[in-house]
Structures are given as structure tokens and as C-alpha cells.
Amino acid sequence: MPFAQVNGQKIFYKDSGGRGPAVVLAHGFLMDSSMFDAQVAALSDKFRVVTWDERGFGQTEHDGKPFTYWDSANDCLALMTHLGVDSAVVGGMSQGGFLSLRAALTAPQRVRALVLIDTAADVDSPEILAGYKQMVDTWVTHGPVDDLVNIIANIIIADPVENPKWIAKWKARQKELMVHPSDCLLNRDDVSSRLGEITCPAIVIHGTNDNAISAERAEALRKGLRNAEPIVWVDGAAHAANLTHPHVVNPPLRAFLERVA
């Protein structure tokens, strides 16, 4: 299994290899690098696609300390360095997008373009944060009980085939592993006022049924970026459009990468 020892973390990653332009993709909260398997399959003939597990998720061994999405952005950049990648198209879904924006702000010379899937630059409303905190408290106290994981699966995935696969993964997790990743999510900073600093090309992809991040927030993200293309709306997709609707996501994603990578 490929691991990179960076920033005190043992980061699990998958690298399609090859000499094509590098594309580094980061997963959403409660997900892992496998959520991009369909994108790797669709892109790796022409691109070097790297996917990785963020702190607290998948096979990455987290040091157990608190962290922020700025730390996760630095993990991404350090992984690129470990792999000998000077610059890449960087992107992700939901929290993968949060860290990708921060990577572009941290090291603009290393981020050639951004892929932003079902994500935002701002923070959640107090009402939404309160709901998420209640879910997290239930998980940490009682574990991933059926009612809770079914609700979460329908928010993130909402797919009859994929839901049970991810619920099984969640039930296998130690409940204590939720503490620091959820603190990172719930206490993240708002970077929307800094979007104008990002000058690289960007593509925003968003599910029309995404109830975690609204269409209005996706529009605000696109408008705040100086070089973003029109939003690719994924009809019927919830919060993980690339996972549930790869047949819709992959063609415009590949076309974008061919233009900018």
C-alpha cells in the first residue's frame, strides 16, 4: 500500500502514474479516495490522477491532534512534493474543495487549476451547523447508529446502490475518530472574501439536489473566482455528484482538464 509520511501524518494515496499532467483529487467528509474511482478510470489514459485519504478518514493514519483545512491543504501540497509533482490541477468534493481552495491560496504557483465539486467557500448557517453538531454528538456518544447513518447517507449520497456500501464503511469506524475531523468541519473559516486572489482556471460542478450546499452558494463560489467556467449542473445528484453521476460529471471534467492541464 502506498503511504507518504508528511506533516506528521501517514497519508494513504493512489497514483495512476504515467507522464500526463497531474490531477490531485480530495474526498468529502466521511468519504475516502475510492469515491473518485470512476474519475480515475475515465482520466488516467491521459492524466496522472492522484487520490488520497485525508486526516481522520480512509487508510490514512492521523496523529490524533486537532487540525484545520489549512493543514489539510498543506498535506495535499506535501503529498505533491513527495510524488515529485511541482504543480497540478487540484480539486475535490465538499471538504476536498475546502482544502483545495486553501491550497490555491497557500501556494498559487503549484495549483494550475481547480476542480470544485459540491463545495463552497463560505461557512454553514448557524441552523445548519447546529444540526450537524447534533449529528456529530450522537455519533461520538452512541456510534454510527442506523437512524443516523441513514440520514447522513441520504444527505451525502442519496443512491440506493452506493448508500449501503458507505454505511458499511461508517459502521466499521471507531466513533472516536469523528472528533477532530468534525471539529475541523464545524469550525472552518470563511475564505469567500479571498476568492478574488485565486486567478487559476476553475470548474464548479454541483448536484441539483444537493441539500448540504445550496445552488446559491455554488453560484457565489463561481462568481467569486476570477477565472471560473459556468457551473456544470448535475441533474438529480445530491452532495457527491462525481460518485453517483460519473457519466454526467466525467465528460465536462475531462474537457476542462484537456484545456487547462
Label every PLM stretch briefly.
Residues 198, 204-206:
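Short beta-strand/loop motif that positions the catalytic acidic residue
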